[in-house]
């Protein structure tokens, strides 16, 4: 082990963002402390009674240091860093299929439109049984292992063996790997003749472009007012949030600002010229909406551009700077805090080093009744703020508090349904059903509108699910739970079938048919 590695790394990290005087003073102090760590590591490596994995020892030391800071400063090794960054880069290299595993066999749900697999003729329902002469079907290979074989550098070939329904012999395709987009937008469709909904799952490099494209699509379909669904959106890039906010706000409007100890304060303002600056907006959030999702919803709320509906957001308002280490690993170090235009700090309170308590915050909210009862939420006067145009009262203290609270419906899904879905019984039943009936369904339902209106989940399919559940000792407690579980299963099955025949917009169109948060947003926009 290079005994100077820890010293040089620490001094480099310390020097980032400090002025000259602070650098000199702090570096002198830290150099003395780091020598202890270096000497300890060297002595362990040289003299400890057993052999030691010095690489792991250093990683554990870094994790130990960061764990004493805030909940979001973190270290990731090279492999973890690559996986973490992939959803935010907007693409990866692969063959371009969406798939699920059915009884140890990969079943193609959909080839990515215009992707490499679609170009060579791979179809929905195909089973990929081997990759480059390696059998992947029926061998209990993990999903991660299969993905490693399907992915590879752009331009390389994947030789695939395909089993197709009603064709006896295995088919073989050579697929040239290419850049495969990782889309942020899950759904974009019209809820009413005037109101459109866009749901997206993160804030990546391509998210702004996807949102603009989705808005343009819905405007062509008659959209005048918009619901932005940020429920369960964990955030992503700050710049993506600022770019999206600019599509709704006037030029110069403050979106968010940051304040830190060793970095300059920074403001992000709307660039103006947005694509949707007139219509009404409702933003949907919940306890899992975080980071960039809170920046966007906070800006729309504080600038009185729209209303926020749902439950208090997660409360992640710490700015991380990614600090790359030469071996491909990375430290994400908190350097500042986010503040909404009205001055609210997005970050919820935390105890340094108490990562367990921080992780249980949502559970604590549930136990205290915050997710189910608005009367359980109280704010001191010190946490009251005013919006910038209408001077409406909004609340700080961590996260974004919605203008209109919609409680979590804890009785909507039965215990029996949750157990059945957790075992994968519904997913597998859907895969078998769509595999047998895809062509028949496409012929019978030429449009999604017809499917949504007329399709009913067959009783036999429901019976298959209950039969498999009984084998796994899962049963409804009584007739009332059975009836409610029937409804839960029929709804998710219809949505999954719609997804497999069309796409995710059709899936959410069914899932959201009786959703209380969406219904409340529609009601408010129609006033």
Language model: regions and residue ranges:
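Conserved functional hotspot residues or short segments at active or partner-binding sites
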Residues: 345-346, 350-527
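N-terminal, post-signal-peptide region of Sec/Tat-exported proteins
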Residues: 45-83
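Structural motif
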Residues: 125-127
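Bacterial Sec-dependent N-terminal signal peptides
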Residues: 1-30
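PDZ/PDZ-like peptide-tail recognition elements
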Residues: 60, 72-110
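Cleft-lining beta-strand/loop regions that shape enzyme active-site pockets
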Residues: 20-33, 37, 41-54, 77, ...
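Residue-level recognition of conserved beta-strand edge/terminus positions
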Residues: 131-132, 163, 334, 349, ...
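Polar, glycine-rich mid-to-C-terminal structural blocks
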Residues: 292, 304, 311, 315-383
